[in-house]
Each structure stands twice: as structure tokens, then as C-alpha cells.
Amino acid sequence: MTLPSGHPKSRLIKKFTALGPYIREGQCEDNRFFFDCLAVCVNVKPAPEKREFWGWWMELEAQEKRFTYRYQFGLFDKEGNWTVVPINETEVVERLEYTLREFHEKLRDLLISMELALEPSDDFNDEPVKLSA
């Protein structure tokens, strides 16, 4: 499948995978890509498959000359689902913001190398973390 930008989807998936353990291929559809980061374990006592994590997820949409994004912070529960949940611990929020910024920088650099822009979605008004200079 070729995206509106003219780039083959399979090649983009390969490049996105090289950015780190963020892309969830099974949740990518058509010209949309899904990334997430399990940044902070809520409680290490349960068995690994039962653990919950604080983290973020990002949806990326391919358009002709750019990719647009929207992201959320929240909880990745033991069923493997993301839920928007307020996070009250400063250290956790700082870690999530750091990992999101790091990923955003790598993603932006990759897209620039392909002569594509990375911008917030037109309807994404809730940008709590400053990602671009």
C-alpha cells in the first residue's frame, strides 16, 4: 500500500520500528499508525503479564506532505488497554514527558529526512507537552 505521501506503508513500518519499541503494527490501519510507551510500572509485585504501566500513546496519520499526531497520557491496564487517567505523581509525569519528547524528536528527524513534516492534528488542542521548538 502506498500512502498519500507516495511512500510505501511497509517501508514506513520498517523505519518506524527502527525508532524503538514504540510501534504497534496490529493497531495500524490504512494511513494511520499507532505508537505507545510503557514508561513507568505502577506496581512491580504482580507477575509481569499482570502489571500495569503509566505511559503514553500516539496516533499518527499520513497526509500528502505531512504526518499529523495526537497523543494521550494514561494507564495501560492488565488487559492491555489504554485509559486516559490523571497522573498525580510529578516524577511519573516528568518521565512520561521525557520519553514522549525523545520519541517525538526521533520521529520528527526521520520524517524530515523523508521531506515530510510532523505537526499536531488540526483538531488536537490538548498539547500539554511542548514537543517542537
Swiss-Prot record:
<dbReference type="GO" id="GO:2001008">
    <property type="term" value="P:positive regulation of cellulose biosynthetic process"/>
</dbReference>
<dbReference type="GO" id="GO:0045893">
    <property type="term" value="P:positive regulation of DNA-templated transcription"/>
</dbReference>
<protein>
    <recommendedName>
        <fullName>Sigma factor-binding protein Crl</fullName>
    </recommendedName>
</protein>
<keyword id="KW-0804">Transcription</keyword>
<comment type="similarity">
    <text>Belongs to the Crl family.</text>
</comment>
<feature type="coiled-coil region">
    <location>
        <begin position="90"/>
        <end position="111"/>
    </location>
</feature>
<dbReference type="GO" id="GO:0005737">
    <property type="term" value="C:cytoplasm"/>
</dbReference>
<dbReference type="InterPro" id="IPR038208">
    <property type="entry name" value="Tscrpt_reg_Crl_sf"/>
</dbReference>
<keyword id="KW-0010">Activator</keyword>
<keyword id="KW-0805">Transcription regulation</keyword>
<keyword id="KW-0175">Coiled coil</keyword>
<feature type="region of interest" description="Essential for activity">
    <location>
        <begin position="99"/>
        <end position="122"/>
    </location>
</feature>
<dbReference type="Pfam" id="PF07417">
    <property type="entry name" value="Crl"/>
</dbReference>
<keyword id="KW-0963">Cytoplasm</keyword>
<comment type="function">
    <text>Binds to the sigma-S subunit of RNA polymerase, activating expression of sigma-S-regulated genes, such as the csgBAC operon encoding the subunits of curli proteins, and BcsA, involved in cellulose biosynthesis.</text>
</comment>
<dbReference type="InterPro" id="IPR009986">
    <property type="entry name" value="Tscrpt_reg_Crl"/>
</dbReference>
